[in-house]
Structures are given as C-alpha cells and as structure tokens.
Amino acid sequence: MSQEKKVFKTEWAGRSLTIETGQLAKQANGAVLVRYGDTVVLSTATASKEPRDGDFFPLTVNYEEKMYAAGKIPGGFKKREGRPGDDATLTARLIDRPIRPLFPKGYKHDVQIMNMVLSADPDCSPQMAAMIGSSMALSVSDIPFQGPIAGVNVGYIDGKYIINPTVEEKEVSRLDLEVAGHKDAVNMVEAGASEITEQEMLEAIFFGHEEIQRLVDFQQQIVDHIQPVKQEFIPTERDEALVERVKSLTEEKGLKETVLTFDKQQRDENLDNLKEEIVNEFIDEEDPENELLIKEVYAILNELVKEEVRRLIADEKIRPDGRKPDEIRPLDSEVGILPRTHGSGLFTRGQTQALSVLTLGALGDYQLIDGLGPEEEKRFMHHYNFPNFSVGETGPVRAPGRREIGHGALGERALKYIIPDTADFPYTIRIVSEVLESNGSSSQASICGSTLALMDAGVPIKAPVAGIAMGLVTREDSYTILTDIQGMEDALGDMDFKVAGTKEGITAIQMDIKIDGLTREIIEEALEQARRGRLEIMNHMLQTIDQPRTELSAYAPKVVTMTIKPDKIRDVIGPGGKKINEIIDETGVKLDIEQDGTIFIGAVDQAMINRAREIIEEITREAEVGQTYQATVKRIEKYGAFVGLFPGKDALLHISQISKNRIEKVEDVLKIGDTIEVKITEIDKQGRVNASHRALEE
C-alpha cells in the first residue's frame, strides 16, 4: 500500500465524502479513512501470509462502534466497550455479504476487515461509510479482490426515493433499504418496509444501484491513481484424470438417484455412504496414509454432488426432494399449544419447524438501546434460537452467534410494521422463535410462527405476515428460480432471497448471493414468484387462525391507561420516587408514566390495578368550584379554619363563611377533627381554595 498520504473527494447524497490513504494503519495490507459529513470510519484489510486448510473462504468482517465517536462514556463497571452489540453485529454481516462473492474462487488466506467508527454523525450513516471503507481498503491493498463495491441506504417518502435519508426522514419513510453491488449488478439487498409493493421495491433497488455505480466509479479512479500491486493467486488445478475416474464411479454407483432422496436425513446418509464407498476404492489401491489423495477425492466428490444438484434443477427441473421449481413443501400450523404462555404458534414447512412463543410485559419492560445515536426504547423484540438438535447434531451450547442475531433481527424487521401503537396496545412484546427442525428457510418459518403467536395472544396486529425464501441456479445462458428452498439448495445454489410481507405488500427482504450479481430481470421474477408463494402460505396460516383472539391470556398482565395533568406527575412520583415506590409496594403493579401525563398500570390481578388507580386518583384529585365536599377541620385560626377536602388538598373556610349567623370565635362552633360539608367558591391564581358552609345554608 502507498505510504504517502492521498486525499480524494466527492459528494454523496448532498454531503461531502472524503477517502484518505497512506497515513493511518500502514502495516495493514490496506487501510483508508472515510469521512462522510462528520462521520469518520477507519477501515483496514489484512490477509494471512499462508492459506488455510479447508473448503471454505476464511473471511471475517468486524464493525466496532467506539462510544467516544458520539461523545459518550460506556456504561457498566469497567467503563469500556465490550463485545459488539446486535446493531454492530448486523452491520458486520451487511458488509460481509456483498464482499464475499468477489474474492477469487479457491482463495483460502485468512482475510480480516476491521471497521472502527471514530466519529458518528447520525445523519451520515457510519454503516454505509464502513461498507465503502471496506471496499476501498481491499481495493488499495495487495489482496486479490474483484471490486470495488458500494452500498447506499434508500428511503421512500411521498412517492419519492431518497438516497441516505436523515434520521428525521427515516421516521416518516415507508422503506428502509440497504442495497449494495458493483458497477454491473446488485449483489446484496436488505430492507424493512411498510407494505411496499414488489414494483416499488424493484424500483428502489435499482434507484439505489444508480448511485452505487457513481460511487464505484469514484473508487475505481482512486485505485487507478494508486495502482496497487496485487498478490499473484493461481488456483490449484485438479488432476483431470482423477476427476474423470471419480466421476465415472459416481455415475456407476448412482449419484443421481442418491441426490433424489426426498428425506433430508436419509439423503445425507446415502451421500455419506456413496462418498465412503468411492474413497475406499482409492484407499485399496494407494497408501492408506495418503491423506492428500483422500482429501482431493472428497473435494472432487463434493464438487460433483454440487454439479449434479444444479444440473437436475436447471436441465431436468427436478429438485432433490422431487418438487417443481415453484412448489412449496407441505405446510402445518398450530396455535395455543403452550397453556401457560401468553401466546404460541407452531409452524412446520417440510422438515423445517419453528415454535414461536410470545410474552406480554408492561411498557417498562422495554429494551434500552444505547448506541452511537440517542437512547432508544424498544418495545417489540424477536429472538431466534437454533439449537444443535434441530439438524440432528451435537455440540457446545453457546450464546447466540451472528447468524442467530441476524435471523432474529430479520424477523423483527418483518413484523414490527404490523405491531399496534402504544396507544392501541400498551404492552411490551417479546417473541422467541425456537427452531426445532431445520432443512432451510428457518428464519422465514420463525416469521410465520411469530404471526401465529401474535394472533393467538390477542395482539391486534394490522395484518398477518408470512415469509418465504427463494433460490437460484444459473447456467451460462439460463436460470431457474426456486420457491421455498431447502438446505441443499441454499448451500449449493446461487441465491438465498428471503421475502416477508402481508397480502398487500413486502415488510422485509434479505438477499445473499454467491455469484457476482443479479440482473433486474432475475430480481423482478424472484419478487413475483415470492409473492405468489407468500400468499399460498398466508392462506394456509389463516385456516388455522384467521384473526387475533378477542381476549388476552388469563396469565398475561392487564394494562389500564389513565391520564393526569402533567404538572401532577411530580406528585405521583414524590420526592426521590418515594410516592411511586409506595404505590408499587402496596399494590404490586408496574407503573409507567409518560411526559404528557399518560399512566400505564400493569398487573395480572385487576384488583391490584384498581387499587393503584384509586391511590393515583386521590393524589392527583383537584378541587372544583361549585363542588361540595365532606371536609375535616385540620387547623383553626382567628380568621377561619383550614379544612381538608381530600388527601393533599386543603381549603380556607373563612369565619364569615361558616354560618349565616354571626360568629365571634371559630372555636365556638368548630374544633379540630370535626367534619363539615363545604362548597368550593373560589380557586385563585396561586391555586389557593376558598370554601363556604354558609352557601349551603342559604
């Protein structure tokens, strides 16, 4: 990489974009500093000296949000950044997906992309800056990379598409789309949307691609100026004689029939047996310790299996489980299978099964998000778990990994647009989707299961949502789009395109591909085929439960809303929270108070709610002119008596207002503790209350 500082500038969505090279992190293979508005991201690319054994490309993308970038000190005892949060993990995945397909086939060196957010401007996306930084760090390095790529955020407001909308614009946008690609094609899409049509989504994707092309041209100019010298990478060539011999054995032993085993576990077992038989043929003839030969035979076998699966789909239109390209696996749905939970849905599609379980909580049970932007209170959460037994395997039980976090977030994005507002449903909602079986499309099964759980729980959702995953097999001059892909089609195909939505439109999409990019024609056809599949699944789900239940579970908390004047909030809270804690301790409820005076009272027992409401009403009660009260004498003065109308509110009963008859001394007719009926005659500007008993006698 060049050691001389160079600065390159352009404009991006009305803001300055600057890329600097040659000054920072010079021991990395490639490093750039990206300045976008007031956002600053350092992106580096580093590769290992030697390749790694194995049949996968060891690429790692990291995205680190430094709290100092937003002028914050991290919370917690240690006061330093810990492991990446969910948003940082999702951004790392977002950057990984468009970059990964653009490395040479067979490249096995460890590659690590590091993105450090050094300064964060909420209106100048650090995520998109990091994507460009990652592309540039690779492009100016000696690492072989077939980029550059770029990514943009697209919004949709009042029928117009916007590149990189501001925080304020995102709040009113019907679309939050991230799209990435290179000059010739799109190779990554991720979006959440408010029932966007397929055509609107298609236009948004390619509106974004126009800006991507300009950004790629800008990066290419930088590369041409720097002229990095790339590592020479020569892929390992197969022994063609060995390939032909292994291929002949697979045909002899019935590879086609083995692939066309409809049951996943049986197919996997049959393929393992076939591979073992063929490998044994070579072990019998060669040195049994010749591990290199055995590895080579296994690698050839894996390639031949992939080629056969793709040939069957592309040429014979037969899928491994016997389905047609647009056919969905058998469906089954159930609700209400867990008696003590607040809502549950079981969704099964072929050999993929998800159990989604819903819990309702008070508004105070929200998740607090404290990242580089303002603190956010999240009242809808979807979590996804993928245990080892779901694919018949054993292994250590760990905290959720990147994949589980990503699938959970995709489901959350697909469902959040149908969740009712706080005013209509004052609850925090958490759904956990447990994948019990998996043979592909488990994230979409979790979306379907979650919709069932929402309706089973009685959540008044705006519309049901279903999800489906689309696949793709390309040939030189043709392509085949697959509906509802299974695991083998995902692993050996060219695309995993997940689409979720209602009957009216899309609420979330996510596209991963293993080829350079997709044309407009393929994306358009995939979206339409996904729409038909989504509606078929939706119709099945609605046969199980067609609308939300009218009542919540008996075990769900009840939430009652009441409103007080904002200036009374401090009375309910009390000094240092004393009064509100007393209410909670006495009644056992959860209290959430909004700044506008709205109070949410939550508890399982209605009697607890009623008692809390009574206490709050007593605290916030106000005297009204013309109303009568049974008052208690609290203090006597020469000029009258102070009487208590209700807790926290006293009134002056002037001596002239005690009786229509003349009174010399207050003590002649009243003593402390006496009860007397009074009428409120005046409340002055300072809130002082004057009362009269005489007015009731006249």
From Swiss-Prot:
**From the UniProt record, which GO molecular function terms apply?**
3'-5'-RNA exonuclease activity; magnesium ion binding; polyribonucleotide nucleotidyltransferase activity; RNA binding
What are the record keywords, sorted? Cytoplasm, Magnesium, Metal-binding, Nucleotidyltransferase, RNA-binding, Transferase
One Gene Ontology term from the biological process aspect of the record: mRNA catabolic process
| Gene Ontology, cellular component aspect | cytosol
Q: Where in the cell is it found?
A: Cytoplasm
Looking at the record, the residues that make up the S1 motif domain are: 626-694
Per the UniProt entry, the signal peptide is none
User: Domain KH: where?
Assistant: 557-616
What catalytic reaction does the record list?
RNA(n+1) + phosphate = RNA(n) + a ribonucleoside 5'-diphosphate
Q: Which family does it belong to?
A: Belongs to the polyribonucleotide nucleotidyltransferase family.
Q: What does this protein do?
A: Involved in mRNA degradation. Catalyzes the phosphorolysis of single-stranded polyribonucleotides processively in the 3'- to 5'-direction.
Name listed for the protein in its UniProt record? Polyribonucleotide nucleotidyltransferase
Source organism:
Staphylococcus aureus (strain MRSA252)
Query: Source gene?
Result: pnp
